[in-house]
Amino acid sequence: WIMGHMVNAIEQVDEFLDLGANAIEFDIDFDKDGIAQITHHGIPCDCGRKCTKKAIFTEYLDNIRQVTTPDDPKFREQLVLLALDLKLQRISSAKAYRAGEDVAKKLLDHYWQRGNSRARAYILLNIPLVEDYEFIRAFKDTLKNEGYESYNDKVGINSAGNEDLDKIRDVLEILGIHKQVWQADGITSCFARGTERLKEALEKRDTPGYNYINKVYAWTLVRKSIMRRSLRLGVDGVMSNNPDRVIKVLKEKEFADKFRLATYNDNPWEKFRG
């Protein structure tokens, strides 16, 4: 999976898909009451990027629904995964449950259209800190209460805050989540980062019977040398400001026979058995 990073303006969706991304990440900004308002990162952000691009969240969902619906004029077959980077660290933890309710209802109304939409992308909820786990509980409670619990099959959880992996596992255990889990490791493209935690996550992913990590991705990669390093370690995905660079690396002799772009037929919740 090649995730286009910080795709917060509607016009950026096609831009990143044209560069080769098959997944996009966008930031969800909340008001003080936990209501999702806009797709927006803000300052600071990655080096060389404009931090202020944004869209109304519901309008963004309406557009991305079309982009991921077969036979729609806007349909782009390659886009199979949507990563919602939830900026919960900007609001009180006491509002995390309200935020989870709100995002679930907006996805129901504007993306899935309560069963009337054929939009098919998988959804990845990026939680910044495990202390915000009430968001996940609320999201799942809302799908159940609204009568659309089946959409859980399309939704995965990702911990994006570089926290202790065992601490993350403990919270997932509390929530009763033993599947559909991604693990991110990374840092803004402005800085270098070692591989110790990334290797630990990959080791846990590959441990038989360990159900708290199904996929691992590295972020935010812009240098080809770091992309190569991550691929050699065996990551499932790369988040980048430059998907075209990832495509070029994947075509290199060392990787061409080992990796390919994920399609809709690849289940993002299953561990890859090479």
Curated annotation (Swiss-Prot):
Keyword Lyase: yes
Source species, domain of life: Eukaryota
Presence of keyword Disulfide bond: yes
Entries under SUPFAM superfamilies matching the protein: PLC-like phosphodiesterases
Tissue distribution: Expressed by the venom gland.
Enzyme Commission no: 4.6.1.-
Reactions catalysed: an N-(acyl)-sphingosylphosphocholine = an N-(acyl)-sphingosyl-1,3-cyclic phosphate + choline; an N-(acyl)-sphingosylphosphoethanolamine = an N-(acyl)-sphingosyl-1,3-cyclic phosphate + ethanolamine; a 1-acyl-sn-glycero-3-phosphocholine = a 1-acyl-sn-glycero-2,3-cyclic phosphate + choline; a 1-acyl-sn-glycero-3-phosphoethanolamine = a 1-acyl-sn-glycero-2,3-cyclic phosphate + ethanolamine
Cellular compartment(s): Secreted
Required cofactor(s): Mg(2+)
Cofactor detail note: Binds 1 Mg(2+) ion per subunit.
GO cellular component, one term: extracellular region
Record keywords: Cytolysis, Dermonecrotic toxin, Disulfide bond, Hemolysis, Lipid degradation, Lipid metabolism, Lyase, Magnesium, Metal-binding, Secreted, Toxin
Gene3D superfamilies found in the cross-reference section: Phosphatidylinositol (PI) phosphodiesterase (3.20.20.190)
Cystine bridges: C45-C51, C47-C190
Homology family: Belongs to the arthropod phospholipase D family. Class II subfamily.
Chain's role: Dermonecrotic toxins cleave the phosphodiester linkage between the phosphate and headgroup of certain phospholipids (sphingolipid and lysolipid substrates), forming an alcohol (often choline) and a cyclic phosphate. This toxin acts on sphingomyelin (SM). It may also act on ceramide phosphoethanolamine (CPE), lysophosphatidylcholine (LPC) and lysophosphatidylethanolamine (LPE), but not on lysophosphatidylserine (LPS), and lysophosphatidylglycerol (LPG). It acts by transphosphatidylation, releasing exclusively cyclic phosphate products as second products.
Protein name, entry field: Dermonecrotic toxin SdSicTox-betaIIB1bxii
Organism: Sicarius cf. damarensis (strain GJB-2008)
